[in-house]
């Protein structure tokens, strides 16, 4: 029997056993589809991700120090999904979601499903049930560190239960991965960082919940607060840096910076100005900003105010930036590469 007949026989047997479509050629025309994405609320981050946003049908991990903007970024993704008619759910394991802040970011609270589970097992069971339904587009788990195993809750405060949470996450992700892909649901895990003891070389930082999430996640975002935004003497927001640490859909290691304004979320207008200057769409002469010979204002804050009052110009700049997305992505990758080289030389 030649190879072709043997292969046909094997394929027929697989389809009889597991159903039609259980195995196919990757290049079959009807099977090749573009990956659906959901915007992050940050234009520069959408470009850095290479596919225009966070991918549906995949696992995403957002991690960083406290008060760095992890939940804010996840809520922006929920708001963007809801704008397109998506169904979203929020597993609030930390019991710390602020509905007033979520509404300010554009989240439709009336159509957001929320659960505040008592144990890690309960949280992950609810997650699996929602994913298997096939009706949810975005599901956020906040956070992995708060997924406390039932045995730990029932035990004494001083009980040593090493690896319990890691085993819980590993088992849950094994069960969830196939369901997430089939249902085309994006699951965002928010995670915290911890310090490893006795690390002499390299970064001592690690994320909670073991290594399973690092492997199963298609996208991992490291978000950090790198500075403060002041209005006279009052701090009104954070300068935030996000690095795409892992990306299975496009080149990783791109790095972007944007502003998060307290009570407002990600400053879209600030991004339009910064990215516009970077690719030459917005001209900067001294402290003045202009677009198509139209002066936007003196200083970044005045230029932002002008765009706030003239939404049509802001839309024009955004359209032009999206058309130049490839050029911006290359520049982001080069900048991140040079920074990595400098840090390696310093070590």
UniProtKB/Swiss-Prot annotation:
GO terms for biological process: DNA recombination; DNA repair; SOS response. It is found in: Cytoplasm. ATP binds at residues 64-71. It holds the Pfam family RecA_C. It comes from the Bacteria. Keywords: ATP-binding, Cytoplasm, DNA damage, DNA recombination, DNA repair, DNA-binding, Nucleotide-binding, SOS response. This is Protein RecA. It comes from Bartonella quintana (strain Toulouse) (Rochalimaea quintana).
């Amino acid at each position: 029997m030649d190879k072709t007949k043997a292969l046909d026989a094997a394929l027929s047997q697989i389809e009889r056993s597991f159903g039609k479509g259980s195995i196919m050629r990757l290049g079959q025309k009807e099977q090749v589809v573009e990956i659906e994405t959901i915007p992050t609320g940050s234009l520069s981050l959408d470009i850095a991700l290479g596919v225009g946003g966070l991918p549906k049908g995949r696992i995403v991990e957002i991690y960083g120090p406290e008060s760095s903007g992890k939940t804010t970024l996840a809520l922006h993704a929920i708001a963007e999904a809801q704008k397109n008619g998506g169904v979203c759910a929020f597993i609030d394991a930390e019991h710390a979601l602020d509905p007033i802040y979520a509404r300010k970011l554009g989240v439709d609270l009336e159509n957001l499903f929320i659960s505040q589970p008592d144990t890690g097992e309960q949280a992950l069971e609810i997650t699996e049930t929602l994913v298997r339904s096939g009706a949810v587009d975005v599901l956020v788990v906040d956070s992995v560190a708060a997924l406390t195993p039932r045995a730990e809750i029932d035990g004494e405060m001083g009980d040593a239960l090493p690896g319990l949470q890691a085993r819980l996450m590993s088992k849950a992700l094994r069960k969830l991965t196939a369901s997430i892909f089939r249902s085309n649901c994006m699951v965002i895990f928010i995670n915290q960082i911890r310090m490893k003891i006795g690390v002499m070389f390299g970064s001592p930082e690690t994320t909670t919940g073991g290594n399973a999430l690092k492997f199963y996640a298609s996208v991992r975002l490291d978000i950090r607060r790198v500075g403060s935004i002041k209005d006279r003497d009052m701090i009104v927001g954070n300068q935030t840096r996000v690095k795409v640490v892992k990306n299975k859909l496009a080149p990783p290691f791109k790095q972007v910076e944007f502003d998060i304004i307290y009570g407002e979320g990600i400053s879209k207008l600030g991004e339009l100005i910064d990215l516009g200057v970077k690719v030459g769409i917005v001209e900067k002469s001294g402290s003045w900003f202009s677009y198509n010979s139209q002066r936007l204002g003196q200083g970044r804050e005045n230029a932002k105010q002008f765009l706030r009052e003239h939404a049509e110009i802001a839309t024009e700049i955004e359209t032009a930036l999206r058309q130049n997305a490839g050029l911006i992505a290359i520049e982001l990758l080069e900048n991140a590469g040079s920074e990595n080289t400098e840090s390696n030389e310093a070590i």
